[in-house]
Amino acid sequence: MNALQQKCRPKHQVLVLKCYPRTIKGAVDVKPNSSELSYLLFYCQSRRAKIQKVGSFLEKKTASDVYHQRIGNVQVTLQILAALIEKSPKDLPLFASCVLSILEQVLKSSDITMVESSIPTFQAFCENHDPTSLAADQAYFRQYVSVVQQYASLASTRPAPGKAQHSKPIALRWRNAGLEAIRSVASSDALSSMVARQYDILVPMILENLWTENEDFLDVLLQRVQGDNNVEDAPLLRRRTSNATAQPSETTGGEPGPNPIAFLGTAVDVDKLAEEDIGVLAMQCLRQVFVAPSRSQTHNPTIALLRFIEERVDQNEQVVKRDAHGKDNGWAIKVFLMAARWAPVADRFTILLTAIEVLTQRPLTDDNLRHHNTQAAMISALLRSDVNLIGLSVMDVLLNLLRHMQRLVQMPGDPDSMRVEDETIGTDEGAIGQRRELLFRLQQCVGDLATHVYYADQISDMIQTILLKLRPSRPTSPPNSSPNGERSDNGAAEDQPLESLFALTVAKIAALKAIKAILWVASPRTKMSGGHINLSRNRVPIQTWDGTQWLLRDPDGLVRKAYVDAVVTWLDRETTPADSLARDESARTTLKNRAAQENNLARRVVSSASARVDKSANAPRSHFLQLLHLAIYDHALQFVDYENDLVLLHVLLAKLVSQLGVNAAKFGIPMIFRLQEDIQDVETPLGKVRIGSLVHGYLWTLTEKFDCEGTAPGSAIHGEIIRRRSKNFWVEGINIPAPAVDLVGTPGQARPPPQMNMRDLESEALLPFDERASLVDCICTGYQELATSPPTSPTTSPGRNFTHPMLGSTLSATPKDETQREVPAQFRELMLGDWTREAVLANTQAGSSQTASLNGTNGTHRNTVNNNNRLGVNGVTSPNGSNSNLRPSSSPTGPNGVQAGRTRKTSIRSNGGGGSPAHSTYRAKAQQPVTSVEQLKAVLSGHLQPPPTSHGINFQHSDDSDDSLVSYDMAPSELSFNPAASGSRQGSPGNTSQAASSPPRRTSQDRTQQLKFGGPLVPGEESVVNGAGGQEGSNGAAGNLGVPISRTTSRTQPQATTAHTTLPRPSTSSKRSIKSRAGSRAGPMSSSWLGEKPPAMDLAALLKGIDSASISDIKSLGAGGKPPY
């Protein structure tokens, strides 16, 4: 009967049955007959129509064998399927459904031996599987997903409900089989198809096998995985050996021998070794998931990873920890970083963007703050790591983080509770602690974002973006603040949805701390061995801080402290020694034109890659230092009752002088001497002591910076400081070197009152320092020594160095000769000149208008700027005085400022105020061709003297032409105080205008009487007392040598204002103490006009500066047409 049945079978069934060897029931490791299997494969290849019948027959036979527990027959069936797949991979779609049905029957058998035998077949199926077939047949798709899910469930570490518990070795075998199947799926092309739900099945099972409370175990697994990869990738370079010389640790197949622990260790050690092997397999599976070159294969597993971590957080597992140094660490961070390193370089940024997307889209409540903190810690760890995130949009990430900050500070409750630094205990306090922790982590994320710099101005753009959010809207701007602080760049501030983000105090503090973190991360090794490293980016320019000085007067003390901390960090990290060199901004345009002409030929040779435009040279002029010193002045008077605020100002002033040198001192010295005069207007004795400490602390800083300790001014300053400190007339914390910002107390909080002797308060006085001219001379001398001491480095090729000085153009680089190492005359005049807050505001407004005009057109807008900044002859006043002090004139003036000679013919750019007939005549004559050879001969022979710089009231200016060689920017020397001409200007109309615009005020009191205490404590102090001079104050003969501490003036002190209002300026007088401004010396620009020998003149500059005037006009004027400035 059996013989007849065999003869009636189809041929494909006969060939299949011949592949099964004769075995007993329950036999394992059975293999098919090789010759019959080869013939079966040939038969299926030659007759493709039979391959579907073969698959159906194997499916029916497997069902019978599984039911009767014929393990050997099942193993033979699985091997036949694997051979068919490998032999005819193109024919797999014909019998793929049969393969999945057979695998599903094996998985339902719950026999570990059958399941382990099915792994090679499933691996061959995944390698040759066509992913497009999954989208074509939904029934086949569901069948495939079911098989994958069953295999993945085998790797679970959690016991399945309703099933018997397996022993430890058997459980490890089940997990190993499941991970092998997962690795097969992860390495196939099916993951790149539309079946994204597979990640939700595979990734959690992989992570379960990697989960451990000891994160160091991950490092061990990673080392083993990397070692295995190195062995696989290493070329076969060993010498061939005979079988007799085979190593005892290797088998003939080249596989490593068994671990000695398996033989020598206990059962516990063997289980640990098996756990480690499973961990290595799980890590290989995770690596295979992320290494695929597909962006979807990076996005989807990242979401699955974040969901698994979220589940662990819900189970109160500690996935993120903090080490002893305060850095985040833990299992979640290590797995997240490993996944980022395994992903393709071009797709790594997808992992970060996915994490930020999940973070920002998650609801923000007190219940899920742990999830936010965990993900923020993971993002911060990835940002500060060395993982390259090519393609990352830094500004988009920054805006998302700022938007999440906004959501955090706008949560229900008191946002100021996040300002508390101490950790509190309790239900509500615990939620507040979680909020503070999340805010701190978001600040870290913003700072760590600076690790990845992909273009030169990225750090500047990041800081400017944050500072832009700090600027208030127009209705809430301070009425007297800088125009830079009021205007918004192209309306971006008003269009941004984050405009109200920093309206809260806690948001301002967080933003400023984030800026500090950016600067710390962007310049990690700024000062090693006293120098700066070369950065592959541009340094943050000073223009970035324009319009932020109002933060120094914020009502909240922590905001003021955070702002000073950010500015001090910027000075520490972003400035170079070249920034302390004097940079004459008034002559910047002339230097640019001259340097452009000299380097024109050299620039033609430079390649296009090297001819990078220097942005610092084209950057608009910054008024930040002027307005910052103005804010310091207002801050000192507004918060005079708080010593911490004055110490904070001292730290800021000291850092400005230390890093910027004379570039900061030219604004700080006039302001500090004005503040010294205002000491007498302070009501309380403690307030006078505090302001006096700030003033002398700044002078102390100048003497240390420019090495003036051994000079007479330095001795006088140090002597007065010693005297005040000996009598407790000093603020604790104003020292040199200045303390760190972190060591300064909270501004706005009063300290305990100092212990002062009331008798000393009634009898002593504060000696002001009036030797201003000698101090400026010492600073100039010290600057010249500092400028000549460091060796100059050779110049680099143009355009290849991104490290530009942050103060301005590189055209004014290291001085070349001895004269250029001196302090410019404009700097000296600024340091010796007068200072008022109205003049500072007017100058900055005029400078901003000029910058806008120079960057715009040459038409009507430039005329409007000049009309706003120049004064007419009708006596209209401005904070700077009359227009007779604004531009030089070639005709001498009389004692009262009236022009003695005929009106000077203007240059092409000079204009008379409007369309007057005289103006038309001058322009017509200026446009006529004239001969200036006689003037040139006079200059070459030495008979032509430079014209005086006095200004006539009829001086007129034109700005409707661009052909003039005179610099359009106003030089500081044209606005400064001229002691030589002060006597002749007392009655001039230009000076009476300033006197009329300001009420009288008291200046330094008359130094004619001795103080009630004894002689000076140091020899240098006597020179200050004996050499002090000045005009009598408003109290007449009642004044003494110093400012009395216990005496209060009849005029009340200006009331403190909020951050959005400015202090009323103390009333001033038109008569100033000449001794306190410039001593008895004449200004540097008046030496040539007093009969001294004029300096050598540049012939090239003179030829360009010859005025277009006739010879008769030259002879009638008796001098050149205009000075060659």
Swiss-Prot record:
Could you say which protein family the record assigns here? Belongs to the EFR3 family.
**Stored SUPFAM superfamilies:** ARM repeat
Bias type Low complexity, positions: 788-798, 855-877
- List every stretch annotated Disordered: 240-261, 471-493, 788-819, 845-1093
**Annotated source species:** Neurospora crassa (strain ATCC 24698 / 74-OR23-1A / CBS 708.71 / DSM 1257 / FGSC 987)
Polar residues composition bias: residue spans? 242-252, 845-854, 878-896, 975-1011, 1046-1071
Write down the InterPro entries for this protein, in alphabetical order: ARM-type_fold, EFR3, EFR3_HEAT-like_rpt
Write out the GO biological process terms. protein localization to plasma membrane
* Pfam families in the record: EFR3 (PF21072)
Q: What is the name attached to this protein's record?
A: Protein efr-3
Q: Which GO terms describe its cellular component?
A: plasma membrane
